Amino acid sequence: MAERRRHKKRIQEVGEPSKEEKAVAKYLRFNCPTKSTNMMGHRVDYFIASKAVECLLDSKWAKAKKGEDALFTTRESVVDYCNRLLKKQFFHRALKVMKMKYDKDVKKEKDKGKSESGKEDDKKSKKESVKEEKTKKEKEKKKDGEKEDSKKEETPGTPKKKETKKKFKLEPHDDQVFLDGNEVFVWIYDPVHIKTFVMGLILVIAVIAATLFPLWPAEMRVGVYYLSVGAGCFVASILLLAIARCILFLIIWLITGGRHHFWFLPNLTADVGFIDSFRPLYTHEYKGPKADLKKDEKSETKKQQKSDSEEKSDSEKKEDEEGKGAPADHGPEGSGGERHSDTDSDRREDDRSQHSSGNGNDFEMITKEELEQQTDGDCDEEDDDKDGEVPKSAHEKS
């Protein structure tokens, strides 16, 4: 009784809200984003102060009219006005408190952690060696799986990942002051929205019209009858489709031994729109040994390609090193002419062997340029031989 008297005294001291204040509070109630939660065992709606300030700054009261100044010009003016609304019991300030686990649950978890830690240490030593071998295979499979999953559409049986949110509760704040920021305020003012009023009025009219069904004209009664039958058939057909698609999936799954997963109208029971529930027409997945073998073959081919590329790079490096070391193994500078002639003769012989091997005959196909080179080389050799014989004969004569 004493609390009620105090509450009445506060209302009398503050005074009743004006029409303008009611209009501002109503606009804020239906346009400011709100969330619902539990407070003291009751379901309440709350809003954040910063969003309320932004909402009022975008309202019609923030724009100046002809002959009148704007009610809200800055954030500070909005905060002052919201303090007036708070004092007139349109909303009140609340404190957000995070929910904590009970001490018993914490102790149980600690005891379980100690008992499991000893067992896990033994298992870890055994599993580490096995995991190292599996990690390489799993990484390759994940890459292939991610590519396939991106192409596939979501089936109705696949569970969606839920985002974990921290739970909290609201408690009344001791300091009832409106502050701009992330402060939480709970709504007390709860007017009836125009939409709810209109919907209620339509519902009342529909009930009265249904009770007067015998007084309707014959044509209207027949039309309503056919409409109701058509709506009932449509609902029944959707239910039958949902049952039939499950039966079809089970039949195909049993016949193929769980390898083929065929869904007719996979999004029929999904949380999507009316049109999206009828597309795609079907989805098919193959989950058998061949799919696993193909993945393994792909991974093996990739490994072989990598090893071949590494071997080629190593062989090329060796050839480059041999090519650099070859000129260091040659003789002195004085034998440069003889080496040049040897290399020329070797090249000619290689060219002849290539021509003969390419044609597959015993006859050698030689171009004009090669014939001229051979004749020039033979003439040079004969001249060298003659020059060598002349000094020998002169020496014998002496």
Curated annotation (Swiss-Prot):
GO CC list: endoplasmic reticulum membrane; membrane
Topology in membrane: Multi-pass membrane protein
Lumenal side: 218-234
Source domain of life: Eukaryota
Cytoplasmic face of the membrane: 1-196, 256-398
Residues in coiled coil: none
Transmembrane segments: 197-217, 235-255
UniProt KW Disulfide bond keyword: no
Residues bearing the modification Phosphoserine: S335, S341, S353, S356
Listed Basic and acidic residues bias regions: 106-155, 289-324, 330-354, 388-398
Modified residues (Phosphothreonine): T158, T375
Regions of compositional bias (Acidic residues) in chain numbering: 372-387
Localization (cell): Endoplasmic reticulum membrane
Annotated keywords: Endoplasmic reticulum, Membrane, Phosphoprotein, Protein transport, Translocation, Transmembrane, Transmembrane helix, Transport
A GO BP entry: post-translational protein targeting to endoplasmic reticulum membrane
Region: Disordered, residue numbers: 106-167, 289-398
Protein family: Belongs to the SEC62 family.
Physiological role: Mediates post-translational transport of precursor polypeptides across endoplasmic reticulum (ER). Proposed to act as a targeting receptor for small presecretory proteins containing short and apolar signal peptides. Targets and properly positions newly synthesized presecretory proteins into the SEC61 channel-forming translocon complex, triggering channel opening for polypeptide translocation to the ER lumen.
Complexes and interactors: The ER translocon complex that consists of channel-forming core components SEC61A1, SEC61B and SEC61G and different auxiliary components such as SEC62 and SEC63. Interacts with SEC61B.
Protein name: Translocation protein SEC62
Organism: Mus musculus (Mouse)
Lineage, opening ranks: Eukaryota, Metazoa, Chordata, Craniata, Vertebrata
